[in-house]
Amino acid sequence: MANLNQIQKEVSEILSDQKSMKSDIKAILEMLGSQNPIKESLEAVAAKIVNDLTKLINDCPCNKEILEALGNQPKEQLIEQPKEKGKGLNLGKYSYPNYGVGNEELGSSGNPKALTWPFKAPAGWPNQF
């Protein structure tokens, strides 16, 4: 067990450390208070970054080539207009007689002998289903 003198020494050391930290915190707060507000500092840093990037972009040789190519283009672009929009494909009803397809009960064919599904085997064929 720790004796009373050791505990007193440790408590006094902690107290002195706490007082020194308190004075350090006050000094830091005073130093921060004397500086520009955070918003102004951020705006200054952002402006510096934008200026540096603008300078890099303007000094880039590829940018100069692009600007020269754009400068050599005519002011008005001549675009050919399509002659006439066609009506497109005539997708009306299929006019070819589709005998032999479709289901008679659906009315999709005029042929009464049209194939139906499921397939019905004619008489004499082996029953597969």
From Swiss-Prot:
Keywords annotated in UniProt: Coiled coil, Disulfide bond, Host cell junction, Virion
GO cellular component terms, A-Z: host cell plasmodesma; virion component
Single annotated GO MF: DNA binding
One Pfam family recorded for the sequence: Cauli_DNA-bind
Principal location: virion
Region described as Capsid binding: 122-129
Subcellular location: Virion; Host cell junction, Host plasmodesma
Coiled-coil regions listed: 1-31, 38-59
Function, as annotated: Plays a role in virus cell-to-cell and plant-to-plant transmission. Interacts with virion icosahedral capsid and movement protein, thereby facilitating virion cell-to-cell transmission through plasmodesmata opened by viral movement protein. Also interacts with aphid transmission factor, attaching the virion to aphid stylet when the animal feeds on an virus infected plant. Aphid saliva may later detach the virion, inducing release of infectious particles when the animal feeds on a new plant.
Similarity field: Belongs to the caulimovirus ORF III family.
Quaternary data: Homotetramer, through coiled-coil domain. Homotrimer when interacts with icosehadral capsid. Interacts with capsid protein, and with Movement protein.
Record's protein name: Virion-associated protein
